[in-house]
Amino acid sequence: VERSRGLGDVYKRQSLYKGAKPVLWSVVEKTALADAEVEYEDHTSNTIYVKFLIKNSTDKDLIESNIVIWTTTPWTIPGNRALAYGKELDYSLIVVEELEEDSLAKINDKLIFASELLENVTKEIGIKKFSTKKKFKGDNLSTCECEHPFKQLGYDFIVKPFHGDFVNLEQGTGVVHIAPGHGDDDYVLGIENNVDIIQTVQDDGKYNQHAVGFEGEHIYKVDHKIADKLEEFSK
C-alpha cells in the first residue's frame, strides 16, 4: 500500500514518465545483461573515419568544410544524430593538397580535427601535404549544422555538434559521433540537448526500419557495407 501511495505521489508531481535508455544486451539470448554477467576480452575492431559536411554556421569560414570523426563501431553510424566536441580544445581547419596513393581523402577536402591530433590523423588518412586555414576553440562548432553522411539514403536531418565533457585527445580526431540509442555518454548528451533517441537494432542484432538502407543486416557483419556506402557518398 505504501509503495502504491509513493508511486501515486511521484505521478502527481509529474515525475513519472516512460522512456528508454541503452542497456547491455545479448543478441544471442535476446535479453538484457547485468554488469556482473559481462566479461571483457581483447578484440580487434574495424575502425573508420567519417566526414560530416557543415552546411550552416555563424562562423562562415567553416561552411562546406567537414568535421571528421573516428569510430570503432561503424555499425552505429545509421544511429548517429549528433556530434560531440570539447569546448576548450583547440581545433584546426585544413585543406588537403597532396595524398598517398591509397588515401580515400580528396584533394581540396576541407577537414576539421583537434589540433593536437593533426599529425597522427593526417598520417593515418594518407594526407601527405596540407595547409592550415584556421585554428579555433571547440566552442566555434556550437552553431554548426551538418549533413548526415547517409543523407542520400534518406537521413535528411540536421546533425548538430554539442560540447561533451567526455571528449578527449587520447585517440581519434577530437570529435565524437553520437548515437544516443547505443551508448551511455551518447544517451546522456542526447537527453540534455533534446536529440532524438533512435533505436536502430532489433533484439536479434539485426537492423530495423530506422536503419534505412541496411534493414535486416546484422550489426556484426555490416561494417564493410557501411564503409562502402560512406565511400560512395563521400563528397
Tell me what each language-model feature is.
Residues 5, 17-24, 28, 43-45, ...:
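Generic recognition of stable, solvent-exposed alpha-helical segments in well-folded globular domains
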Residues 9, 36, 49, 53, ...:
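Alpha-helical scaffold segments in soluble metabolic enzymes
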Residues 1-11:
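Single conserved hydrophobic/aromatic residue that forms the stacking wall/gate
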Residues 23-68, 75-77:
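Active-site cores that bind ATP or allylic diphosphates and position pyrophosphate for catalysis
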Residues 12-43, 121-132, 136-141, 147:
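Amphipathic alpha-helical
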Residues 14, 50, 190:
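Residue-level signal for inorganic ion chemistry
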Residues 58-67, 74-235:
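Non-cofactor substrate-recognition interfaces
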